[in-house]
């Protein structure tokens, strides 16, 4: 007993040093299970804060710039000299092409014409006569080729976001959908079928019929279905104030379409610019006729159209110019007539697909109560039925709401309907 006490006193006076295992064990005291990830994140935050402070410069400075001792004026000046702004010019002629001594005649707008050479970064095969180029401001050497100039209003006609309309949303147009897909989708997806038969695929479609029968809706479904570039043009957009502006927009439109791998151009309300030519003695419609003639030339003129499909929609096919309607320009004419009983029933089911309706609604009965109605009229009936349910503070639409809506829209608005008049034109 006394000996053990003496050994403990001796150990306290002469403690033994800690080895590596003891030190590692002591470091783990007070640490949780997520200590290592937390330390790693704290280190990353600290490094990021240091990087931000270095980029921000001096906080006390009004400009936020680094101190003058850290400025590198020589490298900044060299960088400015290397990245000089270029001037836009047009290459009008190539002298001695395909040789080492080739020279290029450029026209700098509002300055002069120059005979220049190529820069170090440009290949001779990249430059063609008539194209826009970027030249430096000192020697006017060609530095880069530029794309053709296109009006921003023409560029904005391209549909970037695909519409959310599919072929299943177009009711009562089964035959029209098949004809449209044969012209648009089949040549793009299976061109070898036309090559084996030795025929050219149809390149244009004219959709005509009364208002509200689904012409524009089907074009939106085509834009959703295909991966080709889709350009939508409203006829009135091409009617410009100044002489030659509309024809220029048409040329730039087809020039942009030819630059794409595959393109679909949809002219909505084409009767605004495609009317038959006549002389009113005043000359007020001369500009519209020039625009129409440019479209006729682009559709099937001296230059090939390329892989461009053209869709046109109108309510008045009788007013269009015969030169616009001939085969080769518009190969197929698709009529959008009034839907029959089965088609009207299908349209009712399409428009009520997202509505909270009772299950026992007789859509065929509603379709029988809407004779000679278009798809737009049926959609208006569905919307009005929902309004009746909202007025009654109900969460579901009943069949009585649809019957009241039919009585209001189909019978009450009959005097505003222009369908009989347009049926005469079509």
UniProtKB/Swiss-Prot annotation:
PROSITE patterns assigned: AAA
Keywords per UniProt: ATP-binding, Cytoplasm, Isopeptide bond, Nucleotide-binding, Nucleus, Proteasome, Ubl conjugation
Pfam entry (one): AAA_lid_3
Keyword Nuclease part of the UniProt annotation: no
GO MF term list: ATP binding; ATP hydrolysis activity
Protein's UniProt keywords contain Secreted: no
A GO cellular-component term linked to this record: cytoplasm
Listed InterPro entries: 26S_Proteasome_ATPase, AAA+_ATPase, AAA_lid_3, ATPase_AAA_core, ATPase_AAA_CS, NA-bd_OB-fold, P-loop_NTPase, PRS7-like_OB
Binding site residues for ATP: 209-216
Family statement: Belongs to the AAA ATPase family.
Function: The 26S proteasome is involved in the ATP-dependent degradation of ubiquitinated proteins. The regulatory (or ATPase) complex confers ATP dependency and substrate specificity to the 26S complex.
Record note on quaternary structure: Component of the 19S regulatory particle (RP/PA700) base subcomplex of the 26S proteasome. The 26S proteasome is composed of a core protease (CP), known as the 20S proteasome, capped at one or both ends by the 19S regulatory particle (RP/PA700). The RP/PA700 complex is composed of at least 17 different subunits in two subcomplexes, the base and the lid, which form the portions proximal and distal to the 20S proteolytic core, respectively.
PANTHER family: 26S PROTEASOME REGULATORY SUBUNIT (PTHR23073)
Protein name in UniProt: 26S proteasome regulatory subunit 7 homolog A
